[in-house]
């Protein structure tokens, strides 16, 4: 049968959500469910240590709300208001919603953006100890009420930050995590023809306890963020910044020898950070070969796709296919015709299934 998996967006609600609407009306109970400030004093303190997730498309971590005359914490986009887990009502409401959905038959919950849910001044507001306390409480309650339900964590962080989200055998947290580091290292190995970083990543995974179970994938609805293990890169005498620049330019198709056709996402000229977008088929060379009418390039692209999927499926864990990968779907550039999403290159691989 089919087990239904639903997203639980732990970090924020839309600004059109009932809570946000009531907060805009000035209802204090609902204003307290977000982090709202009358002046820039505290927001400016947060900004000193809190990185920006989308510096190009959504700069800053706060948004002015005219209705409330408050600055609202918005880590991701201005229309996504961060929840205030310092207020226990937020956790209680969240677990109530999860249990309601579990009672309706949902068997897997994908907890979204979980590393960001706890905020403290003077920190980067990511991966803080309180985050793990909240996930642990969530797991404990699910095990008591609906022990068959699976908790899947979306933790897109540096490799060293991932294992702790499984918790320990005595105090478990997530049942499963996305294999982000494995995915990134697969694509890096394809571009550089250097498997040393990938081998290191496999060694790390095989050294983890048996309770660490990953969802393995090549592509998803989001970008590829080049979060490689910088310490290991340095040990291998690889410059992390130059390596990252090479990778995102390779998959953008900048180099004449590159077979990929992708686009950059959120390029930051200061840090030289950028992410890559595109479907598996386009990043592996099928689109380029087809556009140029080169059958040999297409065949090589198909072989790359098969090799990448074979490598992914050989890893211990649960395999996930992104919609369109099963038919070799290429990039869809029509998103650029829509002014609402034209600046978001992730829609390059978020097309209709066809």
Where are these regions (language model features)?
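Active-site and adjacent substrate-binding regions of carbohydrate-active enzymes
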Residues: 1-354
């Amino acid at each position: 049968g089919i087990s239904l998996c639903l997203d639980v967006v732990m970090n924020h609600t839309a600004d059109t959500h009932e809570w946000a609407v009531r907060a805009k009306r000035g209802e204090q109970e609902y204003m307290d469910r977000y982090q709202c400030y009358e002046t820039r004093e505290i927001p400016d303190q947060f900004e000193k240590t809190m990185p920006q997730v989308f510096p190009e498309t959504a700069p800053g971590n706060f948004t002015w709300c005219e209705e409330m005359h408050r600055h609202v914490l918005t880590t991701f986009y201005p229309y996504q208001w961060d929840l205030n887990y310092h207020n226990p009502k937020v956790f209680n409401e969240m677990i109530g919603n999860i249990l309601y959905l579990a009672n309706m038959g949902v068997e897997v919950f994908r907890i979204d953006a979980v590393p960001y849910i706890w905020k403290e001044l003077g920190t980067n507001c990511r991966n803080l100890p309180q985050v793990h306390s909240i996930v642990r409480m969530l797991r404990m309650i699910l095990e008591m009420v609906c022990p068959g339900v699976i908790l899947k964590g979306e933790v897109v962080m540096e490799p060293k930050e991932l294992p702790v989200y499984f918790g320990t055998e005595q105090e478990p947290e997530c049942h499963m995590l996305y294999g982000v580091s494995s995915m990134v290292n697969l694509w890096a190995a394809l571009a550089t023809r250097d498997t040393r970083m990938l081998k290191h990543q496999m060694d790390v995974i095989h050294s983890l306890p048996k309770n660490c179970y990953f969802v393995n994938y090549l592509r998803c609805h989001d970008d590829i963020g080049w979060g490689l293990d910088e310490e290991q890169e340095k040990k291998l005498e690889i410059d992390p910044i130059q390596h990252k620049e090479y990778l995102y330019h390779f998959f953008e198709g900048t180099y004449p020898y590159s077979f990929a056709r992708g686009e950059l996402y959120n390029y930051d000229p200061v840090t030289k950070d950028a992410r890559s977008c595109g479907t598996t088929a386009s990043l592996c060379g099928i689109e380029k070969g087809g556009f140029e009418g080169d059958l040999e390039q297409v065949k090589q692209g198909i072989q790359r796709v098969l090799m990448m999927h074979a490598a992914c499926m050989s890893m211990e864990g649960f395999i996930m296919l992104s919609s369109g990968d099963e038919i070799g779907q290429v990039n869809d550039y029509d998103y650029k015709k829509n002014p609402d999403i034209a600046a978001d290159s992730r829609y390059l691989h978020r097309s209709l299934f066809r």
